[in-house]
A protein has these predicted regions:
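Hydrophobic ligand-binding cavity/cleft-lining segments
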Residues: 1-53
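Short beta-edge strand/loop motif at the mouth of beta-sheet-based domains
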Residues: 21-22, 41-77
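Hydrophobic/aromatic beta-strand elements that line small-molecule binding cavities or substrate pockets
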Residues: 24, 57, 80-85, 97, ...
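Beta-strand/loop substructures that line and gate deep hydrophobic ligand-binding cavities in soluble
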Residues: 94-144
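Short amphipathic alpha-helical signal-transduction/dimerization elements
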Residues: 146-154
């Protein structure tokens, strides 16, 4: 597989504002990228492959519906879940994100899926982190995940 069609994924943490921004450009249709965000296909790329091994993913894809991911991280089981706040296929998706058992600490993830001349640009903004350390860790995770997403979706 050629990686010449992949624009490097980047994620930048803002520890003062406790938010992060991430972006990747992929030579794929917007609908294809959106589907990778909202289907079981997410298991192949999401949540820092190699560190978080996502094994199950389910969702009730509607505003107010819930999503749930589970797997193994560093030998221990993990669960992440949240609620869909806005769904506008294939342009925008917003959901909360929290660890199961920690609903008092949700962050909010906004995905913007935009066409551009060579394919699709995926911008992510995650806000509401409880600490700068958590924000920095998520930035590393998003960059790794987006690199994997780009590899999978390159024709």
């Amino acid at each position: 597989m050629s990686t010449s069609n992949i624009t490097a994924a980047r994620a930048v943490a803002d520890p003062v504002e406790k938010q992060l921004l991430a972006c990747v450009e992929i030579e794929a249709e917007s609908e294809r990228v959106f589907r990778a965000l909202t289907s079981e296909e997410i298991i192949a790329w999401w949540v820092r492959p190699g560190v978080f091994d996502t094994r199950e993913w389910s969702c009730d894809m509607r505003v107010g519906g819930r999503w749930r991911a589970s797997g193994i991280s560093r030998g221990q089981p993990y669960v992440q879940e949240g609620e869909f706040l806005e769904i506008d296929p294939p342009h925008k998706l917003i959901h909360t994100w929290d660890g199961a058992g920690r609903p008092d600490l949700p962050s909010t993830v906004t995905y913007l899926v935009e066409r551009f001349e060579k394919g699709t640009r995926l911008n992510i903004r995650q806000t509401g982190f409880v600490s700068s350390d958590v924000c920095n860790a998520f930035a590393v995770g998003w960059e790794t995940s987006l690199k994997r997403l780009a590899e999978i979706l390159v024709p």
